[in-house]
Structure formats: structure tokens, C-alpha cells
Amino acid sequence: MSKKLIQLFGRLVAVAALGLGLGQAEAKTKPNVLFIFADDQCYETVANLGHTDIDTPNLDRLAERGTQFTRAYNMGSWSGAVCVASRHMLITGRHIWRAQKAQQVLRGGKKLTDAQKAARDAEFNNLWPQVMGRAGYQTFFTGKWHISAAADKAFQVARNIRGGMPNQTPEGYNRPLPDKPDPWSPYDIKFDGFWKGGKHWSEVVADDAVDYIGEAKQDKRPFFMYIAFNAPHDPRQAPKEYIDRYPLSRIKVPASYLDEYPYKDDIGC
């Protein structure tokens, strides 16, 4: 996993460096775009931002060589989750107050009027990958989609399309149980989740990205790659070598803003 991720981030740095030199190139030159998206990752999990409890050497390299938006905030959601809102805002170009409406238009329904179909098609044609495609880019996607439109239609190439989160065995959530041993293990593949298929989904996404960069070299068009990792969104699973890096004595849990999760009753907690 680490080798593939290092390759991926190394190539991202190279792509970023290419973009920095565009000012001296011809105006018609289009840069390659490699967009990497982690799922629900908080700023407290990046060492470069002053949180050294976690090792993030590749993210640190990108932060040091690029631009950090340290006052950019997720404004929330129309539901108990912020992941779906983040994705719809990015893909549709809508802010939070209009992203839900865009989601509803894209979702459509079984019986739509001609006007509703036209609105859905117009919304779809303005999705980020569609715009990039019309601008002359080869477009590629892998990972978590969670958008109310078909990824394999929005992008020219889409692989290993994942939903909001994987199904998981009850052991991952119903724990710990009083006076009973904890059966859960974040690196045991029998619990499915991110291990479904035998390889951690982060590894799958990284492999897809590295492979496509190699394929894209055969095309004269610049590429737009949307690489969407499901992690660190729950279920909290990772290969053992990464779990072993973080004994409990090293982990500091961030303070909560509320005493209780406001949507706990809705999800059966």
C-alpha cells in the first residue's frame, strides 16, 4: 500500500510542479489535473498543520510545496453527514444551500415531466467532469462517488465505483459489550467493510490511479483524474502495519463540540 501511495503522491507533486511552470508556457497549454479526495478527514490529522500525533509525510510534502487553505471550512450538511454534501458541492459547483436541490434534480424519479428531464440533463452536463471533458480533457474516476448521477457516464473512464460507505458486520459498531471480549479487529478481512474483495479499498484506489497515469501517457490530451478515497470515513479499518504505528498512548482524541451526537436517535444509537 505504501509503495503505491508514495508513487501516487510523488506523481502528484510532479503534476503540481508542471502546473507552476505554466506561466512561462504557451497560454494554450493545459495542465494535467490530479484531484485527490479523502473522506471526512479532519485537519487534526495532518502533521504539517501542527498535529504531529499522526505521520503524514506525503501530505506534508504537498503542503510544503503548495498552497494551504487554512481558513476553509465545511459549512455542514442537510443531513447528519458532511461527506455527501462535500461531494455534491464540489461536483456541481453549488454552495451548501443549493447543493441539496441539485442532488434532487440529478436524482430525478420514475415519472418525470419534459421540464424535469431537461433540468436533470442540464444539471448533469454542468458537472465538473463533464465540463472538463468539453474542455478537451480525458476524464478518469475511481473510488467513492456518492453523487446522484452515474459516475461511468459523468466520466469517460470510471473504475471501482464505491457508494457512501461499505456494508459491515455488526461487530464493527456494537462494541464494546459489557463483560464480553471485543471481537473486532480493524485489520481482519473477515469483517468486510473496506476489506471486501480481499484488498483494502485505499490500496485499490491508489492502484487504479497509478495505473491510469501510465495509460494517460498514450493520449495527447491532458488528463483530469478524480481520485476519491473512502478512508478515513468509517468503518475504521487499516492494514496491521499502520495500526501498529499508533498505540493508544500516542493518540489524543480531539475535543467534542457537543456532549452528544445530535443525530444519535435517527441512526439508532
What kind of feature is each model-predicted range?
Residues 1-8:
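N-terminal secretory signal peptides that target proteins for export/translocation
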Residues 40-43, 68, 75-80, 96-97, ...:
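Solvent-exposed loop/turn segments at secondary-structure junctions
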Residues 10-21:
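Bacterial N-terminal signal peptides
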